[in-house]
Amino acid sequence: VANPITSGRRTALASWLTDAEKGAGRLAARVMVNRLWQHHFAKGIVSTPSDFGAQGTPPTHPELLDWLAQQFIDSGWDLKAMHRLILTSATWRQSSALREDAAEPDPHNHWLWRYPPHRLEAEVIRDRMLAVSGLLDRTMYGKGTLDEAMFRRSIYFEIKRSQLIPMMVQLNWPDTLASLDQRAVTTVAPQALLMM
């Protein structure tokens, strides 16, 4: 029910965006599950996450993408349920070890015969370092901070464009000036020095 004080345009947009029958719901669900897949596997089912149109690349596994999108819609657009579905799949739970019998016919892992190794995000690296050292403060909620010495999870870092956190930038923290569909991945000497 639209709020009588507002025009109802945002509600109409949200309804259209999630309407799988007459709106953009099917496409929105495909885009969203592709982004989730990309987050967990470092590469989406569609490798151009910001372009599902004619200029983008076609999905490597279209049936899987459609099935995941339908599961997402059927779950009531429940992100937690989608993460659980992906993370409990046999594909996610595979070893990342190289198997010669599978590598010969599919050297680029197109058929996902192994879990693809990939770099962790800056936030995950920092949080794991704090957890392993026993310093991680697991307190939830509250204000963000610019204090590099804080021991809370990295999600609580405040983003200030003029005062970025050097460690995070060194580990490919995303540029806050633009919207990115994929994070840059670099391997440079300063990253190795940072980990010493």
Roles of regions detected by a PLM:
Residues 1-151, 156-158, 168, 174, ...:
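Primarily short, surface-exposed interaction patches in extracytoplasmic proteins
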